[in-house]
Amino acid sequence: MELKELTAVELGEKIATKEVKVREALDSVFAEIDARESEIHSYITLDRERAYERADRLQQLIDSGECKSPLAGVPVAIKDNMCTKGLLTSCASKILGNFVPTYTATAVKKLEAAGAVIIGKTNMDEFAMGSTTETSYYGVTRNPRDTTRVPGGSSGGSAAAVAANECFYALGSDTGGSIRQPAGYCGVVGIKPTYGTVSRYGLIAYGSSLDQIGPLAKDVRDAAAVLEAISAYDEKDSTSLDRKDTSFTAALREDVKGLRIGIPADYFGEGLDPEVASAVKAAAKVLQDAGAVVEEFPLAHVKYAIPAYYTIADAEASSNLERFDGIKYGYRTEDYTDLHDMYKKTRSEGFGTEVKRRIMLGSFVLSSGYYDAYYLKALKVKALIRKAFDEAFAKYDLIIGPVAPTTAPKLGESLSDPMKMYLGDIYTISANLAGIPGLSIPCGKDENGLPIGMQIFGDCFKEDLIFRAAYTYEKIRGKF
């Protein structure tokens, strides 16, 4: 097996036993980047020189026995909406095209403490607003499985980099499916943990009540190991949870015997590609044959998830993005007459079309006369969806469904039809509204050879059950 085909944990084991040097791991990754990046465009920024400097320092620590993390020396890519000290963090936007943070996001710091080697910042939809990684100011990312198609979004660069062996794992963020949907399109594993499990400090906010950081990885074991490394209480994040149950790799030792798994009939209705439906139901049958109890059930209110999500997320975005005005940092227009004109032109020139669309929508639903009609109503729907999941998890340990209605669309299709882009997250959004964890795992391919993703939901703090089911499935069916 070539070095590039190893998983992150497998590579970490070989580095720990001195079979592979950290520099060799970097050589493997950068060879793939040099060969494929011009076509795929997974990255906005590469940090090659500093990566090799860190590799040399880590090698000394590993050789001396001072660094024993399972991820020590393993190259990682970071989505470009997480602050990295001394390294451009653009959020794929013109308005942050020259922003170099003076501090590092907590989740990234946790990886650094575990001995990770950061190789660069991945492309994404601008300010994480999109489902295709086509709204980036720095150009589109292509799906490594078929370069005529999108990788999904908004963490499309991270998913594509993992799928193309341009890194061994990556971090992404998930506001409405932005880890799970690109993982499904690119045929990798991605998990959004329970809200508050991973610190959001240093993550450039889109929808603060929905955003969560998580890993994209080659397999389930890698995803569990990375999530374990980045999960911790952080006093710098007011929504951070002090959990004592984040030994996710330990869950991989258990199977699914006796687990109750529900399949929402509402997720298998009109608009779902028959090939996707068939693959997901076949995957559920694999778990049933492995000892789980599987049955269909109705999941109330999920049909209202999309309008509720876009109302809440865009309202929060319109507030969060007010800080980008060209005064202290970022892009500033050169041609202006007064302060008001400078604000107007800076934001008009600095933000892309999709971001401006969502800012306007968010401002509208928060405006006087419409707050109760839209925003308050959306919050009530969010509460109803959370209640529906509470009722479901009183009966089932896990819920299984598709990640997306179809496999990866062609490039350009969603840009010409924004509703198609929004509907691409129809099955993932509910987890963010409810705050529950969800994982995407490959479960087959369509007639064109494109990956199909299965999504596994658990109740809050039940990532261990999700990993048990995902790992059991992966061991039985293998990797697609």
Q: Residue locations for each model-derived region?
A:
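Short glycine/serine-rich loop/turn segments
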Residues: 72-213, 264-266, 315, 401-419
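Short, surface-exposed loop/helix-turn segments at secondary-structure junctions
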Residues: 94, 98, 239-244, 334-341, ...
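Short, conserved phosphate/pyrophosphate- and ester-handling motifs at nucleotide-, phospho-/glycolipid
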Residues: 18, 79, 219
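Short alpha-helical scaffolding segments that buttress acidic/His motifs in well-ordered protein cores
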Residues: 25-29, 308-309, 355-363
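An N-terminal boundary/leader segment
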Residues: 1-52, 289-291, 479
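Structural helix-boundary/capping segments
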Residues: 35, 164-169, 173-271, 277, ...
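Residue-level signal for inorganic ion chemistry
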Residues: 29, 51, 104, 223, ...
